[in-house]
């Protein structure tokens, strides 16, 4: 199982935004510089986050982005869904007639990977942006 850079960067950028948006709106340029993420890539990500009402943009010379919700109400699953990130541990589609291995059956370890996927998704559903902020404060020196 692997998350794409889109999902990882969305989470990183939102943690960065949450750290600073209580002062003023945060520019994507500032997030880009602090996190080492391409500005063009951030613009694509934030377009999706805005469309899904996780962030809102503020126009003007002091403009930028702010969270649209309390960090405690933004779960990692919300972020992943907003940027079209899906956590998958199996390659097959549940509704596929071909099964996992191109046959009409599931692979021998299918249920193991299905259960793992369920645990991972539950973990992400229970982790909020606020949790990551708290964890970040504890680990920073």
Task: Go through the PLM ranges and name each one.
Residues 45-50:
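Basic amphipathic alpha-helical segments that dock to polyanions
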